[in-house]
UniProtKB/Swiss-Prot annotation:
EC number: 5.6.1.7
Subunit structure: Forms a cylinder of 14 subunits composed of two heptameric rings stacked back-to-back. Interacts with the co-chaperonin GroES.
Protein name as catalogued: Chaperonin GroEL
Catalytically driven reaction(s): ATP + H2O + a folded polypeptide = ADP + phosphate + an unfolded polypeptide
Compartment annotation: Cytoplasm
Protein family (similarity comment): Belongs to the chaperonin (HSP60) family.
InterPro entries listed in its UniProt record: Chaperonin_Cpn60_CS, Cpn60/GroEL, Cpn60/GroEL/TCP-1, GroEL-like_apical_dom_sf, GROEL-like_equatorial_sf, TCP-1-like_intermed_sf
Length: 545
């Protein structure tokens, strides 16, 4: 085991603070509408330009092991805020730095670190409760667009496209962000349920100009097995021929004689039919077939629950207004399932999401829920160059997370105003001793730090701006975008409550641990041994006599 170096007390804290400051100073220049860019060097390709706090934090690794520990702990603050709310990473970093700097000053002055931490924790608990009271519901499209705009660094086009997407697919709907081909941002909305399985045979195509299949008011047969014997399908096909309606078959697979017969019947116009494979694999396929059944008001024909395909009737089939099938996708539009059943299925999937610990499973469950609840929207980000594309895509993703957080827990006045107002409300919090009282003061001071940093980045004197805002009431704050004071909600400067709350909680949690650090242990860097020199050439052998 390599030898370790141990630092104690003030020596340890000074090193840790140096690391905290290096990381926080690099991150905090990005805060606010007039925040600056940070350029990140990449080992291949062009450098990345970003205004995203967590992207900057993730790049930082320091040479000094003790300084690096401080930097990594603040990086954890940014990552946690990003995971919880998807935004607020820079705010969290600024809060953490302020608490650590003031806290370590107090420790150096001889105060008890544990009492300081207790004071900070009490202040944060009280602040979170007040934030929730201050919070307002965010339900209308205008408010959603404003939140998205603020999070995307005052880019109105991003805020509006996200608001439109949410309006189209609902609040539970899936909105994904992709790199587009054009210069402008584009929004593509897929209504109804879409899954990534296309037609099993091109001979089913009835719209040659688009290479797709369109079925109007079709019956939908859902089967959880392979169909290879046409005899199993005959009763259903005979019943269908009488109604004259088209049929979509969704099964594990349709092959051999069964597929050939369906193709021939379709081409002769006897029965209008199309077949696709069921989406997903294993248990997920069973669940997705059940989703389609609930959406279309049908029944999944599965032998494990005692239903045989030969005995299926038209009552077992689902229906929809329209089905569109391409080479890669199947979209079921306006299924005729009962609304109450769809709602309870969505609630069931939501519960599974809460119980799941796997991010992959959660993502798949979220997709299933969205497909049932309303649809899927794809925002295609447009830009002139690859560097701009990466930067813009990161901003769109940030804005999307922020708007989701706003819909979930509501909004508070932006621009750091909410934390300043909350700080004034909890100044008289009860504590047990003077050191705890100072802990509360440290937390209250930190709550001003985001506003001060926004003002500094806008080229203003932070203390003047902070005092002006503190002397105001309610939503009165500083709009750094156009350098004016006024009602933040009226000016459309909103922050999601969840983002502000998460930033404060994670910053206080990790900063509190850093204040109470008394020793640090790190490996002593090994000096790498010099390379061995090449071996000299061997002399030739002398000639033999």
């Amino acid at each position: 085991m390599a030898a370790k170096e141990v630092k104690f007390g003030n020596d340890a804290r000074v090193k840790m603070l140096a690391g905290v400051n290096i990381l926080a100073n690099a991150v905090k220049v990005t805060l606010g509408p007039k925040g600056r860019n940070v350029v990140l060097d990449k080992s291949f390709g062009s450098p990345v330009i970003t205004k995203d706090g967590v992207s900057v934090a993730r790049e930082i690794e320091l040479e000094d092991k003790f300084e690096n520990m401080g930097a990594q702990m603040v990086k954890e603050v940014a990552s946690k805020a990003n995971d919880a709310a998807g935004d607020g990473t820079t705010t969290a970093t600024v809060l953490a730095q302020s608490i650590v700097v003031e806290g370590l000053k107090a420790v150096a002055a001889g105060m008890n670190p544990m009492d300081l931490k207790r004071g900070i924790d009490k202040a944060v608990i009280a602040a979170v409760a007040e934030l929730k009271k201050l919070s307002q519901e965010c339900s209308d499209t205008k408010a959603i667009a404003q939140v998205g705009t603020i999070s995307a660094n005052s880019d109105e086009s991003i805020g509006e496209i996200i608001a439109t997407a949410m309006e189209k697919v609902g609040k539970e709907g899936v909105i994904t962000v992709e790199e587009g081909q054009a210069l402008e941002n584009e929004l593509e909305v897929v209504e109804g349920m879409q899954f990534d399985r296309g037609y099993l045979s091109p001979y089913f195509i009835n719209k040659p100009e688009t290479g797709s299949i369109e079925l109007d008011s079709p019956f939908i047969l859902l089967v959880d097995k392979k169909i290879s014997n046409i005899r199993e399908l005959l009763p259903i096909l005979e019943g269908l021929a009488k109604t004259g309606k088209p049929l979509l078959i969704v099964a594990e697979d349709v092959e051999g004689e069964a597929l050939a017969t369906l193709v021939v019947n379709n081409m002769r116009g006897i029965v209008k039919v199309a077949a696709v494979k069921a989406p997903g694999f294993g248990d997920r396929r069973k669940a997705m077939l059940q989703d389609v059944a609930i959406l279309t008001g049908g029944t999944v024909i599965a032998e494990e629950i005692g239903l045989e395909l030969e005995k299926a009737t038209l009552e077992d089939l689902g229906t929809a207004k329209r089905v569109v099938i391409t080479k890669d996708n199947t979209t079921i539009i306006d299924g005729s399932g009962e609304h109450t059943q769809i709602t309870s299925r969505v609630a069931q999937i939501k519960q599974q999401m809460e119980d799941s610990s796997s991010d992959y499973d959660k993502e798949k469950l979220q997709e299933r829920m969205a497909k049932l609840a309303g649809g899927v929207a794809v925002i295609k980000v447009g830009a002139a160059t690859e560097v701009e594309m990466k930067e813009k895509k990161a901003r769109v993703e940030d804005a999307l997370h922020a708007t989701r957080a706003a819909v979930e827990e509501g909004v508070v006045p932006g621009g750091g105003v909410a934390l300043v107002r909350v700080a004034s409300m909890i100044a008289d919090i009860e504590v047990l001793n003077e050191d705890q009282k100072h802990g509360v003061v440290i937390a209250l001071r930190a709550m001003e730090a985001p506003l001060r940093q926004i003002a500094t980045n806008a080229g203003q004197e932070a203390s003047v701006v902070a005092n002006t805002v503190k002397n105001g009431t309610g939503n009165y704050g500083y709009n750094a975008g156009n350098d004016t004071y006024g009602d933040m909600l009226e000016m459309g400067i909103l922050d999601p409550t969840k983002v502000t709350r998460s930033a404060l909680q994670f910053a206080a949690s990790i900063a509190g641990l850093m204040i109470t650090t008394e020793a640090m242990i790190a490996e002593i860097p090994q000096e790498s041994a010099p390379d061995m020199g090449g071996m000299g050439g061997m002399g030739g052998m002398g000639g033999m006599m």
